[in-house]
Amino acid sequence: MNRRRKLLIPLLFCGAMLTACDDKSAENTAAMTPEVGVVTLSPGSVNVLSELPGRTVPYEVAEIRPQVGGIIIKRNFIEGDKVNQGDSLYQIDPAPLQAELNSAKGSLAKALSTASNARITFNRQASLLKTNYVSRQDYDTARTQLNEAEANVTVAKAAVEQATINLQYANVTSPITGVSGKSSVTVGALVTANQADSLVTVQRLDPIYVDLTQSVQDFLRMKEEVASGQIKQVQGSTPVQLNLENGKRYSQTGTLKFSDPTVDETTGSVTLRAIFPNPNGDLLPGMYVTALVDEGSRQNVLLVPQEGVTHNAQGKATALILDKDDVVKLREIEASKAIGDQWVVTSGLQAGDRVIVSGLQRIRPGIKARAISSSQENASTESKQ
């Protein structure tokens, strides 16, 4: 009995030692399994922003030309200042035009007098014709003279109206509200009616247009994606953001007005026109800008953080994922474009895949890893085409 007890005690001790070793081995194995941060992919939608070059264009342009000839006797504006519709810009010497008006009024008075006398003569001839005291020819002559006299009155009235208009044209006014440019004439200059050179240009800059160019390929691709339902367009006016030449974002949001149905044969592009508020005059005509046109939202898109995408020696994009058994796998993917700090992946991955985004230096394909949730699961989505 004692002998059995002596043999049992060492056996129990050895068993306990083996159990302790197994537990310690399991702990060491768990401790050696690297932890990696993963993002579980789920389909979503992204805003599609087309980045297009363009230039600013005045909303309205008025090239001021004289409609009557004469000598400029006064300039009534300061170059570069705002002028309102109807404001006087130049004064042409009105004296010759006033004389023409006076002459036209005199001609009208003479025509009215002649017409009055012709009417009296015609009425007399008409009365005498009934009693056969005058011939039919004398009556017809009197009627013709009356018609001619009345026609001369009409011509004289038109001459007075034209002379009055010409006198008004001596005061050269702005047809629009805008900013005046550099004057091409000074006081004392002789100008002619409807001359080729403008006196000054007035431009309305608030609001202001931005003319954008888009390649025909991109234009057609966008139409196809909208028609197929891949892109859901914005309802109502299409919003447009603007980046200035210095890299800063313009503070005002514009809207897309229309797209030109004609393709430029030399550039193979179409023109889009956007309109922007310009209350502070920050946008000037001819400025080069870059516009971000909100085309809509692309549906069922997979976004992968940039930390989870690498490129191999052949330049192809790859990603490491954890499969259902927590084994690291290498996937070759198609990463079409970057959106902020994420890639749009069009092939190689699917919804539900766990993409490794941190701890990459501690793993390689084929080994096991322990997943921890990453803080990058949710991110804003804006896609630039």
Swiss-Prot record:
GO biological process terms on file: bile acid and bile salt transport; response to antibiotic; response to toxic substance
Family annotation (InterPro entries): CusB-like_dom_1 (IPR043602), CusB_D23 (IPR032317), MFP_Efflux (IPR051160), RND_pump_MFP (IPR006143)
Lipid anchor positions (N-palmitoyl cysteine): 21
Lipidated positions per record (S-diacylglycerol cysteine): 21
SUPFAM superfamilies in UniProt: HlyD-like secretion proteins (SSF111369)
Signal peptide positions on this chain: 1-20
Gene Ontology molecular function, alphabetical: transmembrane transporter activity
Keyword Lipoprotein: yes
GO cellular component, one term: plasma membrane
Domain of life of the native organism: Bacteria
Quaternary state and interactors: Homotrimer. Part of the tripartite efflux system MdtEF-TolC, which is composed of an inner membrane transporter, MdtF, a membrane fusion protein, MdtE, and an outer membrane component, TolC. The complex forms a large protein conduit and can translocate molecules across both the inner and outer membranes.
Function: Part of the tripartite efflux system MdtEF-TolC, which confers resistance to various compounds.
Protein name, entry field: Multidrug resistance protein MdtE
